[in-house]
Regions:
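Intrinsically disordered, low-complexity, charged terminal extensions of DNA damage-control enzymes
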Residues: 1-17, 23, 184-352
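Catalytic cores of DNA base-excision repair glycosylases
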Residues: 2-7, 11-195, 199-212, 223, ...
Length: 352
């Protein structure tokens, strides 16, 4: 077991990624990086991290910010509940006087699970908590030949126990960073570099030729299709947006008027629909233009098929009164989803 951790740490010192959150013991900065990387690859999250901590350098700066601004800095990272949870947790910490210094306190933060708490506490405070993420599942299942499904209750308990047994308690932060980078760079999901792996002489998966089938998952996520019809209103120098609410995707992000349907609609169906007529509210008949049809946007459990429309109305029109009227020049100030941002780019930068 000691040989396992030593080989991983030796490999990491030679091959590990040089990342800004690895060069600090500041729990706040580590927390921000871990939340960003929960559902985002390092190469995508790096610039977001730099911008986010430049604007919100500590708990108190983040707590004092308006939620709309926090969401704007998160725009493009997806999984926006992470940003809302960050903001809520920062406000609780600011009230309490700063970042918690115990595992229990860190684990109690909104949006922080066992993995994230273990990462923060081992990296910032040197506490002996083993991380268990996708990379760790992959490395351990292959090295030990474990075929217990990682998404089963039995599998989760097993991997937590094994990870804890293998943890280097003298250097928990270094070991955790090593095994995560090893999974990300060496023991990859597809085409792992087994030939030059420092563990290849003891890896069960390599010896049995089963690396490609591990780790095992028993359930596949059910994917649902949704159909969006977005309407960009051009009313002189103004347009209309609203903030999404409820527990649906993209909560608290802004978007143009939307009609969601149970299948893809034609232009004629949209134009004649009660929803569109209600938006017009008896105002003038607009000019309607289909900007783009059938744009596919893939989320973790959903596939959205979107049609983008432009509606042109005179500046004194009474239509779309229930929406927030804003200057087109101010549109960039509002946090929107990637899909909506793509729509706005087509409208406002048609030649790009």
């Amino acid at each position: 077991m000691e040989n396992f951790s030593r080989k991983l740490i030796d490999w990491y010192r030679e091959n590990g990624r040089d990342l800004p959150w690895r060069r600090t013991k500041n729990p706040y900065l580590i927390w921000i990086s871990e939340i960003i990387l929960q559902q985002t690859r390092v190469v995508q999250g790096y610039d977001y991290y730099q911008r986010f901590v430049a604007r919100f350098p500590d708990v108190f700066a983040l707590a004092a910010a308006d939620e709309d601004e926090v969401m704007k800095y998160w725009q493009g990272l997806r999984y926006y509940s992470r940003a809302r949870n960050l903001h809520a947790a920062a406000r609780r910490m600011a009230e309490a006087g700063g970042f918690p210094v115990t595992y229990t306190g860190v684990r109690a933060l909104k949006g922080v699970g066992e993995y994230t708490a273990a990462a923060i506490c081992s990296f910032a405070y040197g506490m002996p908590y083993a991380v268990v993420d996708g990379n760790v599942y992959r490395v351990l299942s292959r090295w030990l030949g474990i075929d217990t499904p990682i998404d089963s209750a039995e599998g989760k308990k097993l991997f937590v126990r094994v990870a804890d047994e293998l943890l280097d308690r003298e250097r928990p932060g270094l070991y955790n960073q090593a095994i995560m980078d090893f999974g990300a760079l060496q023991c990859t999901p597809v085409a792992p570099d087994c030939l030059f792996c420092p563990l290849n002489d003891s890896c069960v998966a390599r010896l049995k030729g089963i690396a490609g089938s591990l780790p095992v998952k028993q359930h596949k996520n059910k994917v649902t299709n949704r159909y969006f019809n977005y309407i960009y209103v051009r009313m002189g120098a103004y347009t209309f947006i609203h903030k999404r609410s409820g527990n649906d995707i993209w909560k608290n992000l802004y978007e143009p008027p939307l009609i969601e349907t149970d299948r893809e609609w034609t232009e004629e169906e949209l134009y004649a629909s009660p929803q569109f007529r209600e938006m017009l509210a008896g105002g003038e008949e607009p000019i309607v233009r289909l900007v783009r049809k059938g744009v596919k946007h893939v989320l973790s459990h959903r596939v959205i098929y979107a049609n983008f429309y432009e509606v042109i109305l005179p500046e004194n029109s009474a239509s779309f009164a229930k929406y927030q009227r804003i200057s087109v020049e101010d549109l960039h100030k509002f946090a929107v989803s990637r899909l909506v941002n793509q729509f706005f780019s087509l409208i406002l930068e048609p030649n790009n």
